[in-house]
Amino acid sequence: MDWQSVSAFAKLFFAVQFLSIAALAQMPALSPLPGTGSLSQPTNSTQFIFVLAGDNRPAHSSDPQSAVPGNIFCAVQRMNPPAAVVLWTGDTISGKDPQHPKRMHDQYKEFLGIATRAGVPVFNAPGNHEMDDSTETPSKVMKDLYRKYMAGTYGAFSYGNTRFIALDSENEPSGAAKSVTTAEGQAKVQAPGAITKTQLKLLKDDLEANKSMAHVIIFMHHPVKAYEKKDGLDEASKKTLEDLFASYKNVSYVISGHEHMYFNSQGPKDLFTPPPARADPAQPPTYLVSGGGGAPLKSNTPGSFFHYLVFTVNGNQITPSLIKVPEINNCTQ
């Protein structure tokens, strides 16, 4: 018997097994929302545009969607050069009603009918209105309805030189979560956003597997760096994510919703300063809140206006633009 050949075969076998396990350990593939199209191959892998917005849910469960999300998706459809994809930071519906699945279906159907106006694939990171019940408690029924009518609750996809990762922040927080105080001064013990250990493990494996990508874009609902602490992730998730993202220099932007406003925690606290361009991978990622997609705006804050963000990728640089959106319907579709 040729033991040298057996040894070489064994090494090859275990190497293949290891690579297969590593591939499986990455985040699951994230699908575009139904009816918004499939992801195509880029004509230029280092030069393209993507759009981000979120938080469009109506003020009340009986209200229709406002004109704002339709205006955003129509603006995307008119872009020249065209956008490759749209990222959404959740709260697509009023939701929070697991007792009435037909009502949830109808709300998703209404939103998806609007999202198709973009003409490009739309990817969503679900929020508390898709995933929780009326007591702000994560609901298995709501999560199952989301998977049935929308997509997976977390996952990733690659486009050109960029990896896009959606996280599901609607999970029970760790026991370390403390009481927080609302802006109105009322103490409450309410579960903030949290990331499960399963997601964190897959996220780390995915970042490790995609170190060669020029950029990684993280999008989710609850902010890592919120305008108000009560709106963010629980401290355990927040610290874990910040430490993890700091270890991977290609993590360019971490963008969340939930707060109905625009907020750049590292930038000036004014109305219209767009996010900074990303060119130096030695710098930490930029943390943003973009929740101006049509839901009732946060009151008495400088960034409370309807908007979306346009990111222009050009090799190792990304340049964002901040676009205000009118409340009156200007979509001709």
Predicted regions mapped to residue ranges:
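Active-site glycine-centered loops adjacent to acidic/histidine catalytic or metal-binding residues
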Residues: 55, 90-91, 127-128, 221, ...
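N-terminal active-site segment of His-dependent metallophosphoesterases
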Residues: 26-102, 227
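Short acidic, glycine-rich surface-loop motifs adjacent to enzyme active sites
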Residues: 88-89, 93, 210-228
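Active-site His/acidic residue clusters
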Residues: 180, 224-236
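Extended active-site neighborhood of metal-dependent phosphoesterases/phosphodiesterases
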Residues: 28-37, 49, 97-211, 215, ...
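Bacterial N-terminal signal peptides
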Residues: 11-23
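Short, solvent-exposed aromatic-acidic interface loops
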Residues: 321-332
